[in-house]
Amino acid sequence: MKDVMLSTRAKAAVRLALDEDLADVADARKSKWCDATSEALVDPEAIATGEIYAKGAGCVVAGATVAKAVMKTVDPKIKVTILKPDGSVVKPQEPILVFRGKARSILAAERTALNFMQRMCATATLAKKFVDATKPYGTLILDTRKTTPGLRVFEKYAVTCGGGTNHRMGMYDRVLMKDNHRRLWKGGDPDELDQAVVAARKKFPKLAVEVEVESLRECASALKAKPEWIMLDNMSVADMKKCVRMCKGISKTEASGGITLDRAKEVAACGVTAISLGCLTHSAGSVDLSLEWRAV
């Protein structure tokens, strides 16, 4: 699991989030960061030790390195120790990370650090539930592009912290022909999907090609060109099983379309290679995290 903070996009997003909280909205570039409350009430030389922990059970840690980066961006002298690395499952009130430094700096970074972590932990925790539910079948749990604008790198990283697997990062790293593409290809003829695969490979020979299908007929058409993946969209269990048999030895299969945790095991039992889930990044919610002082 590669540290998300190695990404230049992640570093830029952390800076933007801090600007949002600490810089004058009129001109963030020229504005000095300011936490007015702390500057008014807290001794500038006061040193404090604090910790972040989850209040509920079963939280999967994600974003500990992000919280550390937030703290260090505000004040490089803050000492941060990660006690529970990303991917760990923690008990209620079990410290995830501990930090020591100027109290003003910690207070300035607090909310931004928690905002990142509480959402990332929620995504990781939900991903783990799906991974655990489908574990007997070895089914991959994939995310989607249904992410918060500007925060995709964090949300997709959080999925991996919960044991999930990243689907394509964007529209540039895989050809994925969905329903709206199909309608624009050869007048939407379901028997011409193989030719769409051929055209995609000709244009982007190094990229994997995936075709979304909604029927056995469309699946059979696409399979003639042997795409790397077939996405089975909103299919019944019976049709999914048939498509899996058709695709065996030719293409990997991905089940998609509003699959809930209650249905995940049944879908996995169909033999699909993977299940993709928009809910991991658009509906996971947030985990209740708290930052508390250990010593002031």
Where are these regions (language model features)?
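Short secondary-structure boundary segments
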Residues: 234, 257, 279-280
